[in-house]
Regions:
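Start-transfer (signal-anchor) and selected internal transmembrane alpha helices
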Residues: 1-114, 349-350
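Extracytoplasmic catalytic/substrate-binding loops of multi-pass membrane glycan-assembly enzymes
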Residues: 113-133, 139-155
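Loop-to-helix entry region of an early transmembrane alpha helix in multi-pass inner-membrane enzymes
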Residues: 159-178, 210
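Membrane-interface transmembrane helices that cradle and orient dolichyl/undecaprenyl
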Residues: 224-238
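Hydrophobic, aromatic-rich transmembrane alpha-helices
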Residues: 73, 83, 177-181, 323-347, ...
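Transmembrane-helix signature of polytopic, membrane-embedded enzymes
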Residues: 180-203, 221-222
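Membrane-interface alpha helices of multi-pass inner-membrane proteins
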Residues: 236-259, 360
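Short acidic/glycine- and proline-prone juxtamembrane loop motifs at membrane-interface regions
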Residues: 209-217
Length: 399
């Protein structure tokens, strides 16, 4: 892997960590005190007659385990870093490619067997009727402008070949699990961390809530994660996957800054120049086309109070994913310490994690979009990848 930014790694690592930990701490406030942000930011809080309905300092359900486990893990991590204890023997273990493929096949088989029963029940999301109208009544041949061609084409294929629009989205969710394995494997150069990353995504309640949904399909996430993997493996194809992500969900376009950081932090030489110029050109072309088509500013607004609502909703939307809620902060610290030892990819993962935490509040602040939990699935993926990198021994990190 590239170490092209190592010369500036201490400054970069501190800057990335400051950005990342600030967002995580802000979002973690509602884990400990669920009503605090709302009571402070209420539009009536300045009135003398205002009385909060609940105690703003009432502890949340996960407050105690959050504080205790975070304290323990951070203490262990700092002692490990300061004392230079070696866990190399523990993380030297890996499995052969054959065993890894067998393990993946078993995991996916269990997942498929446990999920296939969902197809006996109709999808109940409110927007499902709108998706049906586009696919069945309107037809993909009548799509115009910046419509989601990729998403609706894949849904149409699913309906025509399988008789159910949810089959191909389910296959995309399986492909997302496999892609998560490969990107973690590519970063760590080991298979065990890849398997762990895949399992961490699979145990997520948010992932399992939308894995068979045609309304909120995972096409956009799959193509975006694949575009990052291709930067590391087959960079010439990365742009194609990113464009497919945009035409699966236009929200993917605002991931470009994170992609640019990933490129600069993980490539060098001609590859870096080519990817930087091409992604930069893609960004400029996208902004120009979007502004002329009135799709970028069509629902633009400014509702500053929504930013705090978006921050506050973070713990609520992840309430059934306690592993992510509790371990995000120590993961950020561990990735920071790992980056100080020369593992520059830790900075990329921190930027991706914090970026996907920040996008939902910003989206509902500057547009009329609603805050939906499915937008946190990329966070789940990169949380899993981040954890997997800690469990893999990276030779370049060792003193």
């Amino acid at each position: 892997m590239s170490r092209s930014m190592n010369k500036f790694s201490p400054i970069l690592s501190y800057a990335v960590f400051a950005f990342s930990v600030s967002i995580i701490l802000l979002c973690s406030v509602s884990v400990i005190f669920p009503a605090l942000i709302q009571s402070v930011t209420s539009e009536f809080s300045d009135f003398p007659f205002y009385t909060p309905l609940v105690d703003p300092f009432e502890l949340g359900v996960l407050a105690v385990p959050f504080v205790v486990l975070n304290g323990m893990i951070l203490l262990i991590g700092i002692v490990y870093y300061k004392k230079h204890f070696s866990l190399g023997r523990l993380f030297d273990f890996d499995v052969s490619n054959r065993i890894a493929m067998i393990a993946i096949a078993i995991i996916l088989s269990v997942y498929i067997a446990a999920t296939v029963g969902e197809f006996a029940v109709e999808e109940s999301w409110n927007d499902f009727s709108r998706i049906q109208s586009v696919v069945i009544d309107r037809g993909i041949e009548n799509l115009q402008g910046f419509d989601l061609y990729v998403k609706y084409t894949l849904l149409t294929v699913s309906l025509n070949f399988f008789g159910d629009m949810r089959v191909v989205p389910f296959l995309a969710s399986i492909a997302l699990l496999v892609t998560t394995f490969f990107i973690a494997k590519e970063i760590t150069k080991k298979r065990v961390p890849g398997i762990i990353a895949m399992v961490l995504v699979l145990q997520s309640n948010i992932f399992l809530s939308y894995d068979t949904s045609a309304t909120y399909s995972n096409f956009w996430i799959l193509f975006y994660v694949l575009s990052l993997y291709l930067i590391l493996r087959k960079w010439q194809l990365s742009h194609m996957s990113f464009v497919l992500s945009i035409f699966s969900k236009s929200l993917s376009a605002i991931f470009l800054p994170m992609t640019m950081f990933f490129v600069l932090n993980n490539t060098k030489g001609r590859r870096r120049i080519y990817l930087t110029v091409s992604y930069g050109a893609l960004m400029i072309a996208g902004v120009f086309a979007a502004s002329n088509s009135n799709i970028m500013f069509g629902d633009a607004t400014y509702l500053p109070e929504n930013f705090t609502k978006g921050i506050e909703s973070f713990s609520y939307q992840l309430r059934f994913d306690p592993i992510i809620l509790i371990f995000l902060l120590p993961l950020s610290v561990m990735l920071f310490l790992k980056s100080l030892r020369g593992f520059s990819q830790a900075n990329s993962i921190q930027v991706l994690i914090s970026g996907f935490m920040l996008i939902p509040p910003l989206l509902i602040t500057f547009t009329e979009q609603t805050n939906e939990p499915y937008r946190l699935i990329p966070l789940v993926v990169f949380f899993a990848v981040g954890v997997s990198t800690l469990l893999g021994k990276i030779k370049q990190d060792e003193p």
